[in-house]
């Protein structure tokens, strides 16, 4: 054969092998088990993304019956695990998120026979809908296919089942997000100006516990009083009173929020004498909801989904 013919044969062989591999990864292997039964004796482990918000969000999920534990940190080894098992074409956030979960399993911090893995999904604005398939692929490499993968999502995701939180759970998640946004805004401002380093973090720890309790209770009427008390507590911290340049941090959501993913950019900005500003997590969720409305208006997308998004925004 000529060199060109040999290369063409090789290309066809590689394409066939890749197609067969993808089909094998995506087709169901067993009869689906109801989610309640599947997770009856399992703890659901969630990867870290937003250190201020996620402890409160986990408390909200616990109040609706799901035992959710947050992985504590992103070790350098976790990122190495992500690089090892996630395709190089995937984005860096996928490597960080999946690497956290794989690292916990490989270090035996998580018992694979009594655990499940949780991924949060946007269902539209980015490639995060691919994460469950990438994670299941990595689990197969590690011979851990028995570990369930579940999603916290506004729609159906191939390769994973979706946690059902109901309207009560949705209300609690919204409250958790608002508490987290308030804490984030206040803590970043005070950290940039505090005279005694650590004052802001002590208030964050205190108010995280209060916010987790309030979000779990689902009492929306309490939020306004707590927000005022939160502002009073943070502004009672001794501060330098100087006006500093405010530096906005923008970009992919995980990279913005997680210190291990953004190389500690928040602390670096503070050390340079400026005040970091992070967008609200609630604003990101509103963006996701408006995406459904735009899809219906511009591209003829599902109107029912757009109506649901409009009601949630209201």
Protein language model annotation of sequence segments:
Residues 1-314:
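An N-terminal assembly and electron-transfer interface module characteristic of large anaerobic redox
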């Amino acid at each position: 054969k000529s060199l060109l013919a040999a290369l063409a044969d090789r290309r066809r062989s590689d394409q066939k092998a890749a197609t067969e591999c993808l089909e094998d990864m995506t087709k169901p292997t067993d009869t689906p088990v109801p989610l309640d039964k599947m997770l009856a004796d399992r703890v659901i482990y969630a990867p870290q993304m937003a250190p201020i918000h996620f402890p409160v969000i986990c408390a909200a999920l616990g109040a609706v019956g799901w035992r959710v534990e947050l992985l504590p940190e992103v070790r350098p080894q976790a990122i190495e695990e992500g690089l090892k098992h996630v395709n190089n074409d995937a984005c860096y956030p996928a490597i960080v998120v999946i690497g956290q979960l794989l690292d916990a399993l490989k270090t035996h911090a998580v018992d694979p026979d009594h655990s499940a893995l949780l991924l949060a999904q946007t269902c539209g604005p980015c490639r995060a809908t691919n994460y469950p398939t990438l994670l299941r692929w990595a689990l197969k490499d590690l011979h851990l296919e028995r570990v369930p993968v579940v999603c916290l999502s506004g729609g159906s995701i191939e390769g994973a089942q979706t946690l059902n939180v109901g309207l009560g759970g949705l209300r609690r998640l919204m409250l958790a997000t608002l508490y987290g946004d308030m804490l984030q805004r206040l803590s970043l401002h005070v950290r940039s100006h505090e005279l005694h380093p650590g004052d802001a973090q002590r208030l964050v720890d205190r108010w995280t516990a209060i916010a987790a309790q309030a979000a779990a209770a689902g009492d929306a009427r309490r939020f306004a009083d707590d927000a005022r008390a939160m502002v009073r507590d943070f502004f009672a911290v001794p501060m330098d009173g100087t006006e500093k340049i405010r530096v906005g941090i923008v970009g992919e959501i995980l990279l913005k929020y997680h210190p291990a993913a953004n190389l500690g950019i928040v602390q670096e900005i503070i050390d340079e004498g400026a005040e970091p500003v992070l967008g609200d997590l609630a604003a990101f969720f509103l963006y996701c909801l408006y995406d459904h409305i735009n899809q219906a208006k511009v591209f003829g997308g599902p109107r029912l989904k757009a109506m649901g998004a409009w009601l949630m925004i209201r």
